[in-house]
Amino acid sequence: MKQEFFNLKINTTGQRLCEFTDQTIQWINNNKFKDGMLNLSIQHTSASLIVQENADPDVQTDLINYFDKLVPMNNKFYIHTTEGKDDMPAHIKSALTNNQISLSIKNNELLLGTWQGLYLSLIHISEPTRRLS
């Protein structure tokens, strides 16, 4: 079984969803992967990876708004605030989502649905760079 490793660096600003589908497809094409599994992971405790609709940007807005209501930033019960008011909410939101995704590659093509995209979910406001492996 062939195994390759790569890092993808994404520069970010604020809480948002950053799509990285195109960069992933480009990496698959550049490395001529025909068939197999792609395992993506993020080595941060305040960000996550999701597969989500990429056709309508309102989906991203609604997801962010929902998570902000579910896990509010200014909760007086949070004890852990080492990195600011968004620190503990970021940890909770990342615990509710994924830090790893496994996807299939068939005939050199990433198998995603018509409207699916790969997203880095930025939960922590202040970190400017994220690395995916």
Residues covered by each model-derived region:
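Low-complexity, intrinsically disordered Gly/Pro/Thr-rich segments
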Residues: G113-I123
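Active-site beta-strand/loop microenvironment that shapes enzyme catalytic pockets
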Residues: R16-L63
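Single conserved hydrophobic/aromatic residue that forms the stacking wall/gate
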Residues: I123-S133
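Short amphipathic
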Residues: K2-T12
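Short beta-strand segments
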Residues: S41-Q43, K106, S121
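Mid-chain, well-packed structural core segment of small domains
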Residues: D68-G113
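A generic structural signal for short beta-strands and their flanking turns/coil linkers
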Residues: E4-F6, K34-L38, Q43-A47, N99, ...
